[in-house]
Amino acid sequence: TDCLHCLAARLAGWEKRQSAAWLPFIGTCVHERFEHLFNKRKDEFTVPDDDGGEPWAVKRFEAERHVDVGSIHGLHGYHLIHGSIDLYDAENNTTIDWKITGPTTIRNVKANGPSQQYRIQASLYGIGLENDGEPCKRNAIYFLPRNSVSLADALPIEFDFDPKPGRWALSRAQLIANLLDLIEQEDGTEMRDAWIHALPTSPTHCFQCGSWPDDQLGQLSELNENQYPALPDKWRQAIGLLESTYRKTER
């Protein structure tokens, strides 16, 4: 995510307000149907035996493949970073992600490519596969039209697996966790929460914004400022250590 505020709030264990989530429900239903369809398939391919024996058959598709990506350590234990790959194509060493989206997202992807969040998610899936001893060569994202009558408007995107964005995201999350712990140890949880409140939100769009205790007032959330202590300059300057966006050309 490019939303530092939401990432820090999640790492700090803030309670998130749950609301009726109709669009995510639609996405969940589509994912479950695809899982059922691909798990019924019998596609196989053969791989050579390492000991010189007969080649053996391997199932090509695995839906909802669980992977452990890494962990973020802090004062209150650690966060295990894990997830499920919507579909893994073992023959082509490719992760496949279904995105059920509206026309605006599809137009944006056509114009600008997949968002940072989607690319980092794909990178993390590949890292998780490599942690399991599986190779990952490609990442694919299928943008499926939520509002169309057919899949004619679907947009498949495929690119080479790159572990760097995922490693950057994990390192950034650990840095935020370290700063949260440092502030809490030195000045307490209220100051820690004030620092989280001061972090920038997404410059584009974030589905989690508006669901945390400090932004229940939406665009009027700045009225909540007086419930937090004033941030010392050293903590405000620490915000400058954090990057919202991954810049490939600089790495």
Q: Residue locations for each model-derived region?
A:
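Short, charged/polar micro-motifs that form catalytic or ligand-binding hotspots
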Residues: 16, 20, 24, 111-119, ...
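Mg2+/Mn2+-dependent nuclease catalytic core
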Residues: 58, 62-180
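Metal-dependent nuclease catalytic regions and adjoining charged, substrate-binding loops involved
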Residues: 128-251
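Metal-dependent nuclease catalytic cores that hydrolyze phosphodiester bonds in DNA/RNA
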Residues: 1-94, 248-251
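Non-catalytic, well-ordered alpha-helical scaffold segments
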Residues: 27-31, 123, 203-204
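Short linear functional motifs in flexible/disordered or boundary regions
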Residues: 15, 42, 46, 99, ...
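Intrinsically disordered, low-complexity coil segments
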Residues: 46-57, 71-77, 108-112, 183-200
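A residue-level signal for conserved active-site and pocket-lining positions in enzyme catalytic cores
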Residues: 3, 125, 209
